[in-house]
Amino acid sequence: MAGPKRFNKDKRPKRNTQSLLFKRKRFCRFTAAGVEEIDYKDIDTLRDFVSENGKIIPARLTGTRAIFQRQINTAVKRARFLAMLPYSDQHRSL
């Protein structure tokens, strides 16, 4: 009886290492602008950090610092509670 086939390391598709090396360096736009606090009433800024589904985009994708990411989270949650931002954009029509 033949045993379970093992995955051969040589036949694995190789990753494109060049794209990993030349990623664009992300920077915190709040640090660059000199912002100290993020306001929940600034809807235009907050919309840049919310996806189409209504989820808050993580800091590793946006490049914001941890301090500002926490402020974005609280500001988005406050704006949602006050109905300035929707919880989700996908409303089903009956």
UniProtKB/Swiss-Prot annotation:
Source taxon at top rank: Bacteria
GO biological process, one term: translation
Alphabetical list of Pfam families matching this protein: Ribosomal_S18
InterPro entries: Ribosomal_bS18, Ribosomal_bS18_CS, Ribosomal_bS18_sf
UniProt keyword terms in alphabetical order: Ribonucleoprotein, Ribosomal protein, RNA-binding, rRNA-binding
One cellular-component annotation, GO: cytosolic small ribosomal subunit
An example molecular function term from Gene Ontology annotations: small ribosomal subunit rRNA binding
Family: Belongs to the bacterial ribosomal protein bS18 family.
PANTHER family noted in UniProt: 30S RIBOSOMAL PROTEIN S18, SMALL RIBOSOMAL SUBUNIT PROTEIN BS18M
Subunit field text: Part of the 30S ribosomal subunit. Forms a tight heterodimer with protein bS6.
Function, as annotated: Binds as a heterodimer with protein bS6 to the central domain of the 16S rRNA, where it helps stabilize the platform of the 30S subunit.
Name of the protein: Small ribosomal subunit protein bS18
